[in-house]
Amino acid sequence: MDEERALYIVRAGEAGAIERVLRDYSDKHRATFKFESTDEDKRKKLCEGIFKVLIKDIPTTCQVSCLEVLRILSRDKKVLVPVTTKENMQILLRLAKLNELDDSLEKVSEFPVIVESLKCLCNIVFNSQMAQQLSLELNLAAKLCNLLRKCKDRKFINDIKCFDLRLLFLLSLLHTDIRSQLRYELQGLPLLTQILESAFSIKWTDEYESAIDHNGPPLSPQETDCAIEALKALFNVTVDSWKVHKESDSHQFRVMAAVLRHCLLIVGPTEDKTEELHSNAVNLLSNVPVSCLDVLICPLTHEETAQEATTLDELPSNKTAEKETVLKNNTMVYNGMNMEAIHVLLNFMEKRIDKGSSYREGLTPVLSLLTECSRAHRNIRKFLKDQVLPPLRDVTNRPEVGSTVRNKLVRLMTHVDLGVKQIAAEFLFVLCKERVDSLLKYTGYGNAAGLLAARGLLAGGRGDNWYSEDEDTDTEEYKNAKPKEELLKPMGLKPDGTITPLEEALNQYSVIEETSSDTD
């Protein structure tokens, strides 16, 4: 009945009456996402009638009411089949200012029309394959990039930016051709990175370092939403970027990684929004070539170095042990490097473990990221080793028993999801520099058996990657318990699959012990 009354008024053609009836319809159906099939034909005709009204010279408020109802109706895929035409798409492009290259977006009164038009396009493109094809034909991605450039540094039009970015994300998600166009032809990587810089109000202190105000206000809801949409669009643009072939690409990825480091060190308006922001940053960092992730850590600034020195100077000169404790407990600093971003990633990983669900979607991206960072960058690996696998003092409880990060990761090594247990084991193995004896020390043989079997390392040894050599860090507690622990070392295997006699296996293990030592 609502559709029938609205259709009658829309066909009558009086702008004031159309605005009133459509506003009533919008208020009533604002939260409607499922529609009765019996009124499907009426909704199709109402959509057609609204498009006919939109081509006329009507007041802005009437345009907004028309677009609000069209956005609601476009949630129904069946309604879109007859109304998704090139002519109708062009009407929406015109209203969204996507056809006007020289328009500078000075008329604030038009902003609600632009936003509602972009919202309609988001729904229509998402729900209609015909609209997706027309988007290619109309070169919609290029038009969206042009609109972004107009409002790149204009904070008061965040809604326009947000829905422009959302539509760009949808297009790049649905069409691989558009991803390639965005990356190369439209220079989407620097453009979207600049959008993030604007949302975060970044002030650069060096080529890849930004000033962080830890006492500053959180991001506004609008800035956070814009940043999230930009991160999602960037993920699609960079999804195939595993190798860097040109120096310019390497520089651009480092700039983006530096922006993402800044992103990890700021907060949104709520805890949930902060987690969503950081989650999308983690996903995007997974697309950055690992050689460019060195910018996640940076040397301490003069102010940070002075603060470290001041903290130590406040202690009496005879308090050497306390000074060592202060240095050790500063979890943001390692080897003269600022490790804040890595610390945030580690905390993010632990929160995802504590959730206890959706590990494959929520946990594996950050675990994979930390694994690759540790494998490629020595300072990151050594810092994470100190945080996750500190010197082993608890030798009475099983490795999977307890509430430390190590205990939680060891429990994941026997998780039912193959992908989850593989990446958890791989992370710990890399922190142990892919040395079997070190991994067994921290995880136990039973927990590590799956990874060792997959790599053919049940008899001991180490992985294929090279790591630097450092000093032995076995604690006295572990050294005292080690003779008992040796009884649990894996038996060797002969080529025919039979188990090596105990005496022979111990002799082989002794040789390994003499030629290697546990490190960092």
From Swiss-Prot:
The record's Gene3D superfamilies line, in alphabetical order, gives: Leucine-rich Repeat Variant
Listed under GO cellular component are: cell cortex; centrosome; cytoplasm; cytosol; plasma membrane
Residue numbers carrying Phosphoserine: 468
An example GO biological process term is: regulation of G protein-coupled receptor signaling pathway
Domain of life where this protein originates: Eukaryota
A GO molecular-function term, please? G-protein alpha-subunit binding
Indicate whether Chaperone appears among the record's keywords.
Answer: yes
Q: Which cell locations does it reside in?
A: Cytoplasm, Cell cortex
Which residues does this entry mark as bearing Phosphothreonine? 473
The primary site where this protein sits is cytoplasm
Enumerate the UniProt keywords alphabetically. Answer: Chaperone, Cytoplasm, Guanine-nucleotide releasing factor, Phosphoprotein
Provide ranges: composition bias, Basic and acidic residues.
476-488
Q: Could you say which residues form the signal peptide? A: none
**Positions of the region Disordered?**
468-494
Q: What does it do? A: Chaperone that specifically binds and folds nascent G(s) G-alpha proteins (GNAS and GNAL) prior to G protein heterotrimer formation, promoting their association with the plasma membrane. Also acts as a guanine nucleotide exchange factor (GEF) for G(s) proteins by stimulating exchange of bound GDP for free GTP. Acts as an important component for odorant signal transduction by mediating GNAL (G(olf)-alpha) folding, thereby promoting-dependent cAMP accumulation in olfactory sensory neurons.
Q: How does it assemble?
A: Interacts with GDP-bound G alpha proteins, GNAL, GNAS and GNAQ. Does not interact with G-alpha proteins when they are in complex with subunits beta and gamma.
Q: Which family does it belong to?
A: Belongs to the synembryn family.
The molecule here is called Chaperone Ric-8B
